[in-house]
Amino acid sequence: EIVLSGLSRGGFFNEAAFYGGTALRIFYKLDRFSEDLDFALLKPNLGFTLEKYFTYIENELQAYGLNLEVSSKTKNITSNITSAFVKGDTLEHILKFFPNENLNKYNQLLKNIKIKFEVDINPPSGAVYENVYKLLPSPHEIKLYSKESLFAGKIHAILCRNWQTRTKGRDLYDYVFFLANNVSVNIELVKNKLIESNYIKPDIDFNIDVLKELLVKKFSEIDYKEAKEDVLPFIKDTTSLNIWSKDFFISITNNLT
């Protein structure tokens, strides 16, 4: 959240919006751990670079005593995603904030802090945004995808994400979260994302019923054991996964609007 504050001070949200799992966790109380920061430009700009915002991020981190550096990732020339990392020494920061702690309990954490953030520099049209205000770590403003647009991104991920040939369980968990909170989907954004991914043809007569059919087909193909194993490390109440099955996901998809 300190990184988000630094980006805000640098004017980043005049040209980009926040979306993805971490946006859900921070602003909509998704009960799943997520730390990567995902953004999309408000309009395509293939020449966009993140470097101009690095100083703002580093200054914000240093204001809170965090000695972290920001570095960019070499971009694949054919990719629409530009990436950067915030990195630092975990041990240094544990000692700084908890000088009397027994470090044995942090054995699993004693590696470099590494937060990835990615920006889609050529996003499809159709997203809807809202401006939100955060008071902590200090007052700042963020441009955020609407809940409906966030849901569109999640459905696109379920249908199209190429993740080691498997469905990412975290996507399924978030799908249940959206439906449980009665969030409708931004159908225009889903359509445009699916067209961009060559999942559907541009001339298709696309509507909510067609989308449900695509999801039902997908939910019939998923290995739910593997999907559960993916999400287990990121949630506290693992019993909520017991019901996961083809029939469960097909049934709740009837509630999609």
Which residues are covered by each model-predicted region?
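Glycine-rich beta-strand-to-loop/alpha-helix junction loops that act as flexible
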Residues: 19-22
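Structured mid-to-C-terminal alpha-helical surface segments
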Residues: 1-16, 27, 42-257
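Short glycine-biased active-site loop of nucleotidyltransferases that positions the nucleotide triphosphate
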Residues: 25-34
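Structural signature of FAD isoalloxazine-binding scaffolds in flavoprotein oxidoreductases
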Residues: 37
